[in-house]
């Protein structure tokens, strides 16, 4: 899942981004509404965590632009006000969900995941292929009935490959979906992660390298 965090309180924005990355999400961060519009114009996001009171361009206008463009991106709006009238106004503007500050991080994670499920093409709750079972909600992976412990990025890469249902996924696509845009496009992090993932999943190998194209399961 790819998420854009838009929050002018930099410490809060960075803390939210760090927490989401620990949940195997690819996260970009900006600190004002103008930068948010720029990112939305060039990148596809599943969810935007959007502070309402932003400098340069107000969060309401960012939300309106997402709706105007007809994007499938879901918006979780944040605000310092918990007034019912503010929540209603935010939802009427086009936000999909609303979370007043201060908030419990566990609730933020749950709401982002719920919005991400609404963005994605409906799939079975548990993904199964080639003897592998992957539960996106419980963050669990099993190979032939035996649980496999994966790091967040390993889980994210495996989930992308499982969701492709046998189609080839390029290294560039994996980099885009499992990492954020600040990752060096010439890095070998995808190859290294796939190698580690293969080792953890055991024999016989289930991740196939398609020379010049990418990987598939």
From Swiss-Prot:
Any single Gene Ontology cellular-component annotation: protein-DNA complex
Response regulatory domain boundaries: 2-116
Record-annotated DNA-binding residue ranges: 124-217
Xref: SMART domains: REC, Trans_reg_C
One Pfam family matching this protein: Trans_reg_C
GO biological process: regulation of DNA-templated transcription
Keyword annotations from UniProtKB, A to Z: DNA-binding, Phosphoprotein, Transcription, Transcription regulation, Two-component regulatory system
S-S bridge residues: none
PROSITE patterns, per database record: OMPR_PHOB, RESPONSE_REGULATORY
Residues recorded as bearing 4-aspartylphosphate in the entry: 51
A molecular-function term among this protein's GO annotations: phosphorelay response regulator activity
InterPro entries, A to Z: CheY-like_superfamily, OmpR/PhoB-type_DNA-bd, Sig_transdc_resp-reg_receiver, WalR-like, WH-like_DNA-bd_sf
Gene3D superfamilies documented for this protein: 3.40.50.2300, 6.10.250.690, Winged helix-like DNA-binding domain superfamily/Winged helix DNA-binding domain (1.10.10.10)
Role played: Member of the two-component regulatory system CutS/CutR, involved in the regulation of copper metabolism. CutR suppresses a defective melC1 gene, encoding a putative copper-transfer gene, probably by altering copper metabolism.
Protein name (database record): Transcriptional regulatory protein CutR
Source species of the chain: Streptomyces coelicolor (strain ATCC BAA-471 / A3(2) / M145)
